[in-house]
Amino acid sequence: QVTLRELDSNASQSSVVMTVLESRLFEQKIKKMMVPTQMPVANANLGSVFGWRIDPITGASALHTGLDFPATPGTPISAAAGGVVVTQEYQSEYGNIVEVDHGNDLISRYAHVSKVHVKKGDLIKRGQKIAEVGNTGRSTGPHLHFEVLVQGVPQDPQKFLNAGRNLLATPNNRTNLAATSGLYGSNGGSNGTPQAQR
């Protein structure tokens, strides 16, 4: 016959197991929120992709280190994941730029923006409006230039965005995004094509 003490012990062990499982699931959820998988511009068409292309300004072959999303000036730009704003400044190449550190050597970069709604040091959440589409810096038309860097090396942002879509399609998938989606691959060329925007 099971004693009350044994029942209490079993209940306590079950409680510990549940606490550990809940903690792990919560940790995985947080990690997913910190991986830049959300579209930075809603319903935007894709212009230039990541990879080698003919630079629209110089006419020479060059590596395009991100994705371009042509859009009307003033279109909202959202953070692709939560993190801390580490750069908010003007650069001759990128124009007005915002960079968000997501931890784990992951940074997302938003360039050529017009109005900026965050400042360096701000803690931001996934989907938060951080800027507006513009045409600043070395640009041939209004668009967002979006980059994802791993350990300072540009990677194809499309892999991250695809991982986000796959995650939405399979909500019970608890696997690590980086491990299953090839997110930390090399920055070799892809099928980039010449486009109007930089």
Question: Positions of the model-derived regions?
Answer:
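Non-catalytic extracellular/periplasmic "stalk"
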Residues: 1-45, 49
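Catalytic cores of peptidoglycan-degrading enzymes
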Residues: 38-184, 191-198
